[in-house]
Structures are given as C-alpha cells and as structure tokens.
Amino acid sequence: MNSKFIVIEGLEGAGKTTTRDTVVAVLRAQGINDIVFTREPGGTPLAEKLRDLIKQGIDGEVLTDKAEVLMLYAARVQLVENVIKPALARGSWVVGDRHDLSSQAYQGGGRGIDSQLMASLRDTVLGEFRPDLTLYLDLPPAVGLARARARGELDRIEQESLAFFERTRARYLELAASDASIKTIDASQPIEQVSASISQALAQWLTNQEPV
C-alpha cells in the first residue's frame, strides 16, 4: 500500500494524543511500521519558532488575526515541503497532529476571517496537497475546555472565549459534512468507545485503499 498522510483534528481537550496511539496501533497491526509524526504549528526549526509566537505572543504585542493566520501558513509550508512530502516520497506514512483544517476552523470559523480568503491561502500555499484521511474528534467546546484547563496553564488560543470555540466547532462540522476524506468521531464518549470508533473508521478506510 502506498504511503498516506493521516491527520488528527479537533478542539482543545478532544483527545488527539490518545487518538494518535490508537491510529499507530491499527497501522502497525496492518504491518505499517515506518511512521513519521508531525504537529502543527511546528515540526521544523522555523515552524517551532513560529509556534511559540502563535501560542504565546511576544512582549504583550497584540497579534492581529491576519498576522496569526499568515504565520500559521508559513509554518505549515515549511513542514509540508521539508518533512511531510519527503517522508511520503520515501514510503513513510505520516500521522499529523493538526493540519490545514485547523486553520479553516479556528481562523475561518473562530476568528471570522473570510472563507474565500482562507481557501485562497490554502490553495496558494499548499496547491493540491491534501491529507488522505482526517479524523475529526468532535465534542462540545465546554467539555474540551474543561479537560484542557485540568491539564494546567492555557496558551493564548486556549484562553479564547467559549463563543470562539463554538464558532470553531461549527466550521469544523460544516467542512466535515462536505468532505468525504474527513471522518467525524464522537469524542464525548468514554475513551474506550472513542478508541473503538477510531479503530473501526481507520480499519474500514484502510480496506478501501489500493494495494501497492
């Protein structure tokens, strides 16, 4: 089977780390052991610097919405061109913690940046490059935020209002409904059921992939 790019998406507290473990277990059960992990923003030296700026800000300066989204795309293209595409080209599978869908949901939905501008940015920066499969972990924002707060100190984006995350979730659901490559998982279930749902969705998807 040719290498694939699988992305895990969702709001804060949705359980992306646990999902990654489940995805890896399913892939390895299929004999897929050459797996590269990525996170966004981040994943290259420059992208990690941008991650710090996006997550923490700098010296109290107000970070405008457009500056934020441009930094996200700068970090993303560095990761795609320097890590993800080379990994796929050499036959590795890539499992990513967030990708472009996050920007479409958080900046397009949460921040309210024009959807045409967001689509134009995506197409200009990434061209036709897209994940092969996206697992979107859906849960009520209040539940996710409670989980995030229980982990400790919140970053700049995690401190946004509940209304911001409601708008973000709404955009996630809107985009997932119109894209067959996005599988929505109910992440409000007990962790065992979430893992079972992920395993089932991924296993079914794998059976539909062309062998090498």
UniProtKB/Swiss-Prot annotation:
EC number: 2.7.4.9
Residues bound to ATP: 10-17
Leading EC class: transferase
Keywords: ATP-binding, Kinase, Nucleotide biosynthesis, Nucleotide-binding, Transferase
Cellular-component GO terms for this entry: cytoplasm; cytosol
Reaction equations catalysed: dTMP + ATP = dTDP + ADP
GO MF annotation list: ATP binding; dTMP kinase activity
Record's signal peptide: none
Swiss-Prot/TrEMBL GO biological process terms: dTDP biosynthetic process; dTTP biosynthetic process; dUDP biosynthetic process
Top-level taxon: Bacteria
Function: Phosphorylation of dTMP to form dTDP in both de novo and salvage pathways of dTTP synthesis. 5-bromo-2'deoxyuridine monophosphate is also a good phosphate acceptor.
Family: Belongs to the thymidylate kinase family.
Record's subunit section: Homodimer.
Protein name: Thymidylate kinase
Organism per entry: Yersinia pestis
Organism phylogeny: Bacteria, Pseudomonadati, Pseudomonadota, Gammaproteobacteria, Enterobacterales
